[in-house]
């Protein structure tokens, strides 16, 4: 499973990725970003509570705060949306979490390294029966986080599908939950989740 960061909950809402960019911009300027980080924490807590999970992201948010203060960069900041959502999804499904930075690679020029990624990702996926790999990011040769362009979780999904040798890759986006039809075509499609594997 390859999740994106949480998107808009309603029309005038803000995507978590945009919240993270704004939060990091303040940190990068040496300004207080506590209120912005607290809003992001609340957003994830709402998801955790909605799923009735016994999950605490305090440690992860502590690391994020420290790295923002250390000016870890926009790529790192933006990637945390997928990373945190991946932790939640893995907890909810009972799957392993595989940090994309350990299995998705870019070369020294910032270009996607398909050969290295496929080799490492295939081996890592073989160690897990079921896994969640957060979308949108990977790592540079020096270990720093690098993101794909906006919408990069779709790219990650196809990369993971190739490495896993799946027969079918399904890309579900822009809806809250799992629906039986595209809500842009069918008004109020029924939420339907009977089985996921």
How would you name each of these model-derived features?
Residues 1-197:
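Nucleotide/pyrophosphate-binding catalytic subdomain
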């Amino acid at each position: 499973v390859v999740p994106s960061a949480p998107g808009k909950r309603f029309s005038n809402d803000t995507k978590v990725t945009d919240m993270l960019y704004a939060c990091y911009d303040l940190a990068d300027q040496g300004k207080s970003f506590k209120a912005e980080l607290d809003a992001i924490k609340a957003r994830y807590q709402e998801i955790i509570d909605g799923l009735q999970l016994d999950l605490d992201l305090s440690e992860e948010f502590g690391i994020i705060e420290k790295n923002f203060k250390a000016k870890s960069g926009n790529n790192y900041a933006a990637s945390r949306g997928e990373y945190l959502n991946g932790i939640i999804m893995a907890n909810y499904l009972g799957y392993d979490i595989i940090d994309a930075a350990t299995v998705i690679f870019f070369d020294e020029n910032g270009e996607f390294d398909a050969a290295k990624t496929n080799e490492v990702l295939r081996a890592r996926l073989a160690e897990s029966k079921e896994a969640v790999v957060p979308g949108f990011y990977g790592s540079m040769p020096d270990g720093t986080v690098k993101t794909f362009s906006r919408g990069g979780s779709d790219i990650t999904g196809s990369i993971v599908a190739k490495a896993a040798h799946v027969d079918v890759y399904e890309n579900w986006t822009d809806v809250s939950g799992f629906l039986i039809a595209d809500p842009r075509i069918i008004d109020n499609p029924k939420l339907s989740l009977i089985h996921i594997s």
